[in-house]
Amino acid sequence: MNESLKRTPLYELHLKLGARMVPFGGWEMPVQYSSVIEEHRAVREAAGLFDVSHMGEFEVRGPQALDLIQLVSTNDAAKLAVGRVQYALMCYENGTVVDDILIYRLDEHRYWLVVNAGNTQKDWEWINTARERAGLHNLELIDRSAEIALLALQGPKAEEILQPLATGVVLSQLEPFSLAKNVTVSGVPTLVLSRTGYTGEDGFEIYVKAEDVAALWEALLEAGDEQGLLPCGLGARDTLRFEAKLPLYGHEISDQHNPLEAGLGFAVKLKKGVDFIGRDALARIKEQGPTRKLVGIEMIDRGVPRQGYPVAVGGEVVGEVTTGSFSPTLEKNIALAYVPVAHSAVGTEVEVIIRGRALKARVVETPFYRSPHRR
């Protein structure tokens, strides 16, 4: 494996568990331990534990912290109460996507921005440039990515596995997109514990100091063993998020896509009362209406759609697949794809070009999967 790839503090433990390691966003990460399908089903039916320490964390604090976040975020962080978490996007002036992020409001003037691993350096430079241009000096911006590790415990049994180990929080009272501080898990002090995730299931994300994560990982795996908890890799993380229609940077969103065509308009607040980068372009797109739309596709003919495969209507290529795979939950071959709005209605028949063959498919409702366990 390339020596320049970064490793999380759990690298040796992944190898001990038999993980297959792959490069991802500049990191050497576990793609699977047993099998993607087995790990995927564990999360849907019981629970899975993910090492997502490759994600980036920026702390913004000080009197102008909110001003900076409002400038770079499409969402309205002024409506974010202390102890809550908000999904948002950062956009370029033309409305395309720099990254999608989570904003954590830890205190009155203290926030975290959690960014995608492969975008950490780009995002850091982009936010710093925005700050300089706006002359926002009454704040501190700190890259804490190297000192923070992150585990995601996901699935319907996540709460019952975690609660006996946790002191300082009653998990049944922690709402989705809420956070708790001063929580200890199996003797490990956490920095932040939130009811968030990227699987479409109920679950928690646990932020700890990098030096504490190995003890937490082992304690959680041991505690959840009887309930069917499995360590899970990036393969299952991708199929889980994809079934729930959660976007992945470089697939559904990128500097070639805007949030409105991606179906993320709920996180774009054009009337939040302050200007933000990309606002004018997004206002124009909203007024005119997007020309294309992200849709779900289900294969009728046999074949597995993959990213980049063309989508055609009546033999003419009109769009392309952003993510495609066999769905372990639905046991069908499905895809997300961008197509012109005229061909985006549910039930529309399309073809996916797989290895030169036009295979029949249809546009279906999304998300492909909604958890019966989510709160």
UniProtKB/Swiss-Prot annotation:
Keyword annotations of the record = Aminotransferase, Transferase
Annotated Gene Ontology cellular component terms: cytosol; glycine cleavage complex
Instruction: Return one Gene Ontology term, BP aspect.
Output: glycine decarboxylation via glycine cleavage system
Q: What is its EC number?
A: 2.1.2.10
The UniProt record lists the keyword Transferase: yes
Q: Which reaction does it catalyse?
A: N(6)-[(R)-S(8)-aminomethyldihydrolipoyl]-L-lysyl-[protein] + (6S)-5,6,7,8-tetrahydrofolate = N(6)-[(R)-dihydrolipoyl]-L-lysyl-[protein] + (6R)-5,10-methylene-5,6,7,8-tetrahydrofolate + NH4(+)
Q: What class of enzyme is it?
A: transferase
Q: Which GO terms describe its molecular function?
A: aminomethyltransferase activity; transaminase activity
Q: Name one Pfam family in it.
A: GCV_T_C
Top-rank taxon, per record? Bacteria
What NCBIfam families does the annotation carry?
gcvT, PRK00389.1
Q: How does it assemble?
A: The glycine cleavage system is composed of four proteins: P, T, L and H.
What functional role does this protein have? The glycine cleavage system catalyzes the degradation of glycine.
What's the family?
Belongs to the GcvT family.
The cross-references to HAMAP family, in alphabetical order and at most eight, read: GcvT
Q: What is this protein called?
A: Aminomethyltransferase
Species in which this protein is naturally found = Symbiobacterium thermophilum (strain DSM 24528 / JCM 14929 / IAM 14863 / T)
Q: What is the lineage of its organism?
A: Bacteria, Bacillati, Bacillota, Clostridia, Eubacteriales
The gene name reads gcvT
